[in-house]
């Protein structure tokens, strides 16, 4: 039997009533509040779930950070070597030699010592084209899945066309691996709730509809697990809360004479090498990197006065939150509950770099949820530009998919700070009723997975 760990992104008590299949697992088993880690972001929390440690130990301080040795802010790296500490698969094999693990789309999948790996990986052609694809290990799994369920729907995974199709594909891949390969532990990442809850917030009809939709997609997998006697562990890294106040932290640093840019072809680019301070914005937290230690206190005061900023963590504050790691900024800003940080650093939109208006998660020096929308300044024109660019792409011509706007006020929800309400905290649902806990720390989940495997193996 298998321990099936399903990361249902954004799952909270507020949404569970709209999810009858998951609710039935909770009713028959255990439903607990997951005490997440700070920052409550995808990569740090997943790393804590799988290592049983805090960011100060595993080193994943955000979805990205300033790589000081490279002089570049980089987000959404994929190699597992970035994550420090013992991983759950190492602990599992120490407990049960020969135990097997499959990872379907949890982050930092590449290079991990799992037995089966599936993760999004586009094809980057030499002529600049980007085409949907995915990476697997073993390599033969790629063709097996492609023949069975088709290619990975990359443009449904992120961007203005993000939809249920990506999660449907991921669940189908998980079902295939479970049925054919029967791993001892199966990790599955299901991102669908991330989309409309960031677009519209958690309180409207779109959130309820998204919860119901992903529950339908999960139902066959849950039923198959129940029939086989598998252990189901469904959880989330964070809850998404209403947040409609963007905070332009880098623009404030620039106006204070601290952030520097360089210009090419009329476009401004962040210059981290000569900046006295800049921020890597990541939802509701921002790592602020300060070149001169003597300026840290003054810069903290500047950022603390910005509307929408709740806290600015210094050395002691970072230690108290478990994020005192060399990759962290000298300061870490935390937004107020209804606010979030943009990465924008230009002061005139006509000087914005061309990547600002496209979906480009790797070139932007911070997270950009506005990528989930067609340009609100003219959505019809944006869709027409998309159609024109697609036609040029198919014709083998150069194209620019410039469909993303620069109006951050369109975003409806965010996450990253620790939850202020139990209704907004992430959940952990387990099919085993003997777990019998009201709260479980994210750092306890690694040991819980190993323990659940012992139970199903007996």
Model regions and ranges:
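C-terminal helical/tail subdomains of lipid-metabolizing enzymes
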Residues: 436-453
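Active-site-proximal N-terminal segment of extracellular/periplasmic enzymes that hydrolyze or transfer
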Residues: 1-31
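Short, solvent-exposed turn/loop segments enriched in Gly/Ser/Thr/Pro and often Arg
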Residues: 33-53, 104-113
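Short glycine/proline-rich, acidic loop/turn segments that cap or connect secondary-structure elements
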Residues: 186, 410-429
């Amino acid at each position: 039997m298998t321990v099936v760990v399903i990361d249902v992104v954004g799952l909270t008590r507020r949404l569970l009533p709209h999810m009858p299949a998951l609710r039935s697992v909770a009713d028959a088993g255990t439903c607990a509040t997951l005490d997440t880690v700070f920052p409550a972001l995808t990569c740090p929390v997943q790393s804590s779930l799988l290592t049983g440690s805090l960011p100060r130990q595993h080193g994943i301080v955000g979805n990205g950070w300033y790589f000081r040795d490279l002089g570049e802010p980089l987000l959404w790296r994929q190699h597992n070597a970035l994550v420090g500490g013992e991983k759950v698969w190492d602990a599992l094999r120490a407990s049960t030699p020969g135990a097997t693990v499959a990872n379907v789309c949890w982050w930092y999948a590449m290079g991990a010592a799992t037995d089966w790996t599936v993760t999004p990986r586009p094809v980057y052609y030499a002529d600049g084209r980007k085409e949907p694809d995915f990476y697997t290990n073993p390599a033969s799994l790629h063709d097996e899945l492609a023949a069975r369920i088709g290619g990975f729907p990359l443009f449904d995974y992120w961007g203005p066309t993000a939809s249920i199709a990506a999660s449907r594909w991921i669940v189908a891949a998980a079902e295939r691996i479970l049925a054919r390969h029967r791993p001892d532990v199966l990790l599955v990442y299901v991102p669908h709730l991330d989309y409309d809850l960031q677009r519209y917030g958690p309180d409207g009809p779109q959130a309820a509809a998204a919860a119901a939709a992903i529950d339908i997609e999960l139902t066959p997998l849950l039923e198959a697990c129940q029939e086989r006697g598998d252990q189901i562990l469904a959880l989330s890294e964070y809850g998404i809360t209403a947040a409609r106040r963007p905070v332009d932290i880098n623009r404030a640093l620039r106006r204070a004479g601290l952030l520097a840019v360089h210009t090419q072809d009329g476009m401004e680019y962040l210059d981290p090498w000569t900046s006295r301070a800049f921020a890597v914005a990541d939802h509701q937290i921002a790592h602020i990197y300060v070149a001169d230690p003597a300026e840290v206190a003054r810069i903290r005061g500047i950022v603390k006065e910005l509307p929408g900023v709740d806290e600015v963590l210094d050395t002691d504050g970072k230690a108290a939150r478990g994020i005192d790691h060399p990759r962290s900024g000298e300061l870490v800003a935390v937004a107020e509950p209804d606010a979030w940080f943009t990465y924008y650093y230009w002061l005139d939109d006509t000087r914005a770099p061309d990547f600002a208006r496209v979906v480009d998660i790797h070139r932007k020096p911070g997270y950009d949820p506005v990528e989930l929308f067609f340009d609100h300044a003219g959505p019809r024109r944006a869709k027409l530009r998309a159609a024109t660019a697609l036609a040029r792409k198919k014709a083998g011509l150069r194209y620019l998919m410039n469909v993303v706007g620069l109006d951050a006020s369109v975003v409806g929800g965010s996450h990253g700070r620790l939850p202020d309400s139990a209704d907004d905290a992430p959940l952990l649902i387990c099919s085993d009723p003997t777990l019998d806990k009201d709260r479980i720390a994210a750092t306890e989940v690694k040991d819980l997975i190993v323990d659940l495997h012992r139970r199903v193996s007996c």
